[in-house]
């Protein structure tokens, strides 16, 4: 300033400070109050002191002295007393003042440094420049708008200000709780006076629906309010540099309340323009079109730096509301908030007006979010009860990652995977940013990761699945948060202790981590690392009465599972970690008895999901017995046990699918079914399985394949996960049965190739067979002599291994499906040739010169193969061929040798959604001639063929309690028997196969890739018998007719002498000469068909066998 008084004041303070540095004695003086003139007041720092430092003056008096004064408002001020010239006083006044000071009590305080920092900077222990900028405030007080003062008497408060705030909050909570408990008494007291009644009426008239969270609370929101979760790195290609520069994104978990009714919604500015037309990129991929891309950490630092430079005002630390901002200024005025991943405080009011939630380009209305939230709580959470939630808004306020994870999981119940596909990559990116870039401090983050582990994100290969990494991350975070120490959580965290029932849900989350770690270790064949602790033991012993029964049982099974793996697979004396082969049987017997006692105690069969996992643990015991070098006698006694457990798992899964979709079930149920199918496939290959179980084992494998392929069409076509991967593995294994079946049985034992993946060895062993078969097929230098020796060994000890009848290898244009549910709950699916297929078969017979020849092929598919599997309904074939049977004598010819699939005529099903096969061909088949044939007097089936066919009326359908599959009813061409593997190659093969038989026949092959949208299973039997056995009497009719040259109608009428012309007797009434059947042709046609089918695997699918993700395009060829 230019004021001379101020200059002298500043000079006096400087002299006093400089003088103090040369003195070793300090004299404390009494207070001398000197009032200041108004012109001497300034906003600068005010000095409070009781210490005066004397220089080396001749008369012992200082040129200036510091005294203390107090203004009228009670605020302490610091002033300086100048010399006589400054105050307009004479030297006598100065002398008097000096004498007054000298009368004070002197105290020697050698070496004490004077106070030069203001009180605010001293409280926060930060650097202060108050003495340098005097009389102006220090830099921090000027920036923060604080009152800057220097007070030597000020002492920083002991303790943390945060603790003081906590105490205030606790006090407010107590008062609110008190008022809540006495609300009725307060209301009664208010009603007794007129003023109180007026007050109550005024409160009721206040409308809180328009109150919005934020600093502008109480404003009316005219537009729709959305809350958005921002990502630091959007899973998209980078946009134009200008767009990225002008609209920088912020870190995740930022919450901004903005109106989305305008064109400037946050979603349109986050991560650049969404309308640029560039394809989306997965979140963990690196854009290929960028050369100057910085690492994410540097991007965040650069964006924050640019924001600090360009911003002249500080960012708010609370959500902002821009509901009243002009639309054109919205993007520039909106401030993105950099927040931590702490549990966010609850929204201030249950009536907070949030209309939608935004993540990336996904917008979900509050109604949709509430619907999905309720679906998750009702249909998903009971399988894994580790959390609770009352509303979508409350869940979002607790954790944004948990909220979006719940929305993603609940969207599995949607008929279309549109929302699921959009959210999956975004949530993966959000989880990475939330957990890796910063350290979460909330239990909700661990809960979100556990949900993602139980309902995994889409993945194509085993190593692409990040669920196991999510488990490890949740476990490490939970250790840091003290979830493993229960009631001692206050020693690890303070923010989580105030949550409702914090200890209860933290403990359940820890139990969920223990279970998930054991589960995923067994899925991947890795040793578990979790150790049993106090909380696990407490849950296992049932000491926690509030623990849900399903969670306690799963914890008990997981604990036993860990013990099993530790006993059998952690040996330090063997390189593979396995117990000595000669000692396995004894240890497994002890563990098996312990598991049985556990079953008797906990009754696992009371819950279908728990029973499935219990049977899966039993299969793990069997798998340890099947590992290499285990004596054959020890393996034999576990073969039947493994078969019974696996088939029961598949039966229980079928029952669960009556009320839920397969993709809605948690991974521990789906993996149990997958493991059952794989172990049944292995058992089918070994002669140790009893012959009476072979048919049912094959049926169960096909059932799993059908269930896995017959998801909703849209889901099966666009979502890749463990379900599609398992179905693909089964199909590849089926092709190996055709091309190189010797691969499976070259070595003795059930599991012979792999050994170091614990119970996961089963999966890796089968995948090895797939790769080995491909190598032999594709390698031109394969040792022919070795192949010859292997084949001789295989033919010497072989067991005829028929391929499995997977429906997606058969054209839907040639066969329709009908289904029936038996009283035991087994669903049986039967193939019925379409009218167009029969027509083509007749044309084929005519072209071969046999006008009355039998139908032996349906579009190149030998009926012998279908009859072996029990998949074809011969009577339906005859009905479509106008070989009408009488209503009195016709019977259902369902070749079923297994008890599980035998139809029970005495107890027909009442389920209107299933077929009653016994009524399909035995009712309303009237005697008719060609002239009187009409669609109304005989049953027809809807066909997806290009040739139009008549359909029965709805009354007929209801009367017969029949129903065709959903794809046939809707005419959906993308549903049945579509080629999953190398569609075009299989189409070409079918055409070639048909052309070899008939050069002029038409082939109606579908151009679809999606499987059937029905959870039907397949019925088949007598698969290991040769087609010349008496059980194939249905097909013998055709072969006898082919050998004897008889007419089919004549053949059937011969068995009923009194029957009129055109009425056929039951097929079973015709005696069959087994010796006349062309056995060699049947076998060759069956094998030839599958060999031709397998060519699609060899030629067109060379890149689809890497189920594990072992291979990389950049790997050298020798690898």
From Swiss-Prot:
Region listing for Disordered, in residue ranges: 1-70, 86-105, 236-290, 306-335, 894-913, 926-962, 994-1018
SUPFAM superfamilies: Zn2/Cys6 DNA-binding domain (SSF57701)
GO cellular component: nucleus
Signal peptide: none
Pfam family, one: Fungal_trans
Biased composition range(s): Polar residues: 47-70, 261-288, 323-335, 902-913, 931-942
Ranges of biased composition (kind: Low complexity): 243-260, 306-322, 943-954
InterPro entries: prtT (IPR051089), Transcription_factor_dom_fun (IPR007219), Zn2-C6_fun-type_DNA-bd_sf (IPR036864), Zn2Cys6_DnaBD (IPR001138)
Listed GO MF terms: DNA-binding transcription factor activity, RNA polymerase II-specific; transcription cis-regulatory region binding; zinc ion binding
Primary subcellular site in the record, as a coarse category: nucleus
Keyword line: DNA-binding, Metal-binding, Nucleus, Transcription, Transcription regulation, Zinc
DNA-binding region(s) in UniProt: 118-148
Protein localization: Nucleus
Biological role stated in the UniProt entry: Putative transcription factor. Suppresses the lethal phenotype of RPM2 deletion.
PANTHER family: FINGER DOMAIN PROTEIN, PUTATIVE-RELATED, TRANSCRIPTION FACTOR SEF1-RELATED
Protein name, UniProt field: Putative transcription factor SEF1
Organism whose genome encodes this protein: Kluyveromyces lactis (strain ATCC 8585 / CBS 2359 / DSM 70799 / NBRC 1267 / NRRL Y-1140 / WM37)
Name of the gene: SEF1
């Amino acid at each position: 300033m230019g004021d001379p008084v101020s200059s002298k004041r500043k000079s006096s303070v400087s002299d006093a400070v400089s003088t103090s540095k040369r003195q070793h004695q300090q004299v404390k003086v009494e207070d001398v109050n000197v009032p200041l003139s108004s012109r001497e007041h300034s906003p600068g720092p005010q000095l409070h002191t009781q210490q005066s430092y004397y220089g080396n003056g001749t008369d012992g008096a200082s040129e200036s002295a510091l005294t203390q004064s107090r203004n009228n408002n009670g605020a302490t001020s610091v002033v300086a007393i100048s010399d006589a010239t400054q105050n307009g006083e004479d030297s006598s006044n100065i002398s008097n003042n000096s004498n007054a000071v000298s009368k004070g009590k002197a105290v020697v305080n050698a070496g004490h440094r004077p106070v030069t920092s203001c009180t605010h900077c001293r409280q926060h222990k930060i650097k202060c420049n108050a003495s340098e900028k005097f009389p102006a405030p220090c830099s921090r007080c000027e920036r923060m708008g604080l009152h800057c003062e220097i007070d030597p008497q000020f002492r920083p408060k002991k303790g943390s200000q945060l603790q003081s705030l906590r105490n205030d909050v606790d006090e407010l909570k107590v008062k609110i709780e008190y008022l809540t408990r006495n609300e009725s008494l307060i209301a009664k007291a208010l009603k007794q006076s007129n003023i109180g009644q007026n007050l109550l009426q005024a409160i009721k008239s206040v409308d809180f629906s328009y109150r919005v969270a934020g600093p502008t609370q109480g404003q009316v929101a005219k537009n729709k309010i959305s809350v958005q979760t921002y990502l630091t790195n959007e899973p998209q290609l980078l946009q134009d540099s200008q767009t990225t520069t002008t609209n920088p994104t912020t870190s995740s978990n930022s919450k901004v309340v903005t109106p989305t009714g305008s064109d400037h919604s946050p979603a349109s500015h986050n991560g650049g323009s969404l309308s640029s037309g560039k394809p989306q990129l997965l979140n963990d991929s690196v854009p290929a079109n960028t050369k100057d891309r910085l690492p994410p950490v540097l991007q965040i630092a650069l964006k924050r730096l640019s924001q600090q430079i360009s911003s002249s005002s500080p960012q708010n630390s609370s959500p902002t509301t821009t509901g009243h901002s002009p639309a054109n200024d919205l993007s520039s005025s909106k401030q993105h908030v950099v927040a931590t991943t702490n549990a966010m405080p609850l929204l201030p009011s249950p009536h907070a007006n949030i209309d939608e939630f935004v993540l990336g380009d996904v917008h979900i209305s509050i109604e949709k979010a509430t619907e999905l939230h309720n679906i998750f709580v009702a249909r998903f959470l009971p399988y894994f009860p580790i959390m609770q939630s009352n509303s979508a808004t409350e869940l979002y306020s607790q954790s944004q990652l948990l909220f979006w994870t719940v929305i993603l999981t609940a969207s599995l119940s949607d008929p279309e995977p549109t929302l699921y596909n959009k959210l999956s990559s975004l949530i993966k990116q959000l989880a990475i940013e939330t957990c890796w870039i910063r350290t979460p401090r909330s239990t909700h983050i661990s809960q979100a990761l556990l949900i993602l582990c139980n309902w995994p994100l889409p993945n194509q290969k085993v190593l692409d699945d990040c669920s196991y990494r999510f488990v490890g991350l949740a476990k490490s975070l939970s250790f840091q948060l003290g979830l493993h120490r229960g009631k001692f959580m206050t020693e690890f965290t303070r923010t989580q202790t105030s949550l409702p029932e914090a200890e209860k849900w933290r403990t359940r989350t820890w139990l969920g981590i223990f279970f998930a770690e054991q589960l995923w270790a067994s899925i991947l064949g890795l040793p578990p690392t979790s150790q049993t602790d106090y909380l696990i033991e407490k849950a296992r012993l049932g000491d926690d009465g509030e623990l849900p029964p399903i969670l306690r049982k799963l914890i008990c099974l997981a604990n036993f599972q860990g013990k099993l793996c530790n006993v059998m697979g952690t040996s330090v004396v063997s390189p593979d970690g396995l117990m000595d082969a000669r000692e396995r049987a004894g240890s497994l017997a002890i563990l098996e008895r312990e598991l049985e006692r556990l079953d008797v105690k906990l009754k696992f069969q009371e819950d279908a999901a728990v029973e499935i996992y219990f049977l899966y643990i039993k299969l793990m015991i069997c798998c340890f017995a099947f590992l290499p070098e285990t004596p054959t006698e020890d393996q034999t006694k576990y073969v039947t046990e493994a078969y019974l457990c696996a088939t029961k798992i598949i039966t229980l899964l079928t029952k669960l699918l009556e009320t839920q979709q397969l993709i809605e079930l948690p991974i521990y149920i789906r993996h149990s079914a997958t493991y059952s199918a794989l172990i049944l496939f292995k058992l089918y290959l070994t002669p140790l399985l009893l012959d009476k179980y072979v048919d049912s084992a094959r049926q169960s494998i096909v059932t799993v394949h059908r269930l896995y392929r017959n998801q909703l069409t849209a889901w099966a076509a666009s979502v890749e996960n463990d379900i599609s991967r398992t179905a693909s593995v089964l199909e590849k294994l089926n092709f190996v049965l055709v091309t190189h079946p010797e691969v499976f049985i070259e070595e003795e034992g059930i599991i012979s190739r792999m050994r170091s993946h614990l119970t996961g060895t089963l999966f890796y062993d089968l995948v090895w067979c797939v790769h080995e078969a491909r190598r032999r097929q594709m390698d031109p230098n394969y040792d022919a002599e070795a192949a010859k020796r292997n084949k001789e060994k295989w033919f010497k000890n072989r067991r005829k291994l028929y391929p499995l009848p997977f429906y997606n290898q058969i054209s839907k244009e040639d066969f329709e499906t009908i289904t029936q549910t038996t009283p035991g709950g087994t669903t049986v699916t039967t193939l019925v040739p379409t009218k167009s297929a029969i027509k083509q078969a007749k044309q084929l017979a005519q072209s071969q010169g046999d006008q009355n020849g039998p139908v032996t092929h349906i579009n190149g598919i030998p009926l012998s193969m279908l009859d072996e599997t029990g998949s074809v309904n011969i009577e339906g074939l005859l009905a479509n061929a106008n070989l009408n049977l009488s209503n009195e004598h016709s019977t259902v010819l369902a070749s079923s040798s297994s008890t599980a699939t035998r139809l029970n005529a005495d107890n027909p099903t009442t389920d209107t959604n299933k077929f009653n096969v016994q009524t399909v061909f035995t009712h309303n088949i009237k005697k008719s001639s060609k002239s009187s044939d009409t669609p109304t007097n005989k049953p027809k089936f809807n066909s997806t063929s290009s040739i139009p066919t008549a359909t029965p009326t709805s009354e007929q359908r209801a009367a017969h309690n029949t129903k065709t599959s959903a794809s046939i009813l809707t005419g959906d061409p993308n549903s049945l028997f579509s080629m999953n593997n190398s569609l075009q190659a299989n189409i070409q093969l079918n055409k070639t196969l048909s052309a070899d038989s008939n050069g002029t026949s038409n082939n109606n092959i579908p151009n679809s890739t999606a499987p059937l949208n029905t959870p039907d299973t397949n019925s088949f039997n007598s698969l290991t018998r040769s087609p010349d056995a008496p059980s194939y009497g249905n097909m013998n009719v055709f072969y006898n007719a082919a050998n004897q040259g008889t007419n089919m109608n004549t053949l059937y009428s011969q068995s009923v002498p009194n029957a009129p012309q055109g009425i056929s007797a039951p097929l079973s009434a015709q005696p069959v000469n087994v010796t006349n059947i062309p056995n060699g042709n049947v076998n060759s046609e069956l094998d030839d068909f599958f060999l031709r089918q397998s060519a699609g695997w060899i030629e067109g699918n060379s890149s689809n066998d890497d189920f594990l993700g072992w291979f990389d395009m950049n790997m050298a060829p020798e690898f």
